[in-house]
Amino acid sequence: PTTVIFPESPMNFMYHDDREFQQFIGDFARRNNVSVLFNSAEPDSTNGKYFNSAVMVGPDGKKLDQYDKLYLLPFGEAVPWVLESIVPAFVGNFSYGREYDLFPLGDAKAGVMICFESHFGQLSREYVRNGADVIIEMTNDGYLGPTPVLRQHLANAVFRAVETNRPVLRVTHV
């Protein structure tokens, strides 16, 4: 393989802030001669918050790129601005991403959707307009259990594949 992709995590990892984690991922990438795509909370230098991000480290162990989640889960990752002063910040306080970044995936280009973003067809369509050959969905569906939501989340990925005519690689805990 040229790339190892991990599912969305419950934000236990902060690549930018954790030198030990950087060393671990870098060593893994170099030892296996692969790129590694994983989920991480990465700092937003404009406001002191963090992004829910997908980070790619190359086979040389160095960070290649980062995508910051554009569509945050209301109340889980961000509080709608109207309610920010009413609802406690611990409910969700991530920054919204600003760019439709693509990652190298072998000879292809990939757009990444993180969890809830699979609900938004405009995201995958924008990736394709920007040159994506494949869409990757990184998600942590383990907390959903055997509920209808689990099946609906999977169905969203199928819709994204059909409407973009691109394969969707779904990486999850379930």
Per-segment meaning from a language model:
Residues 1-174:
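Enzyme catalytic cores with a strong preference for nitrogen-chemistry domains
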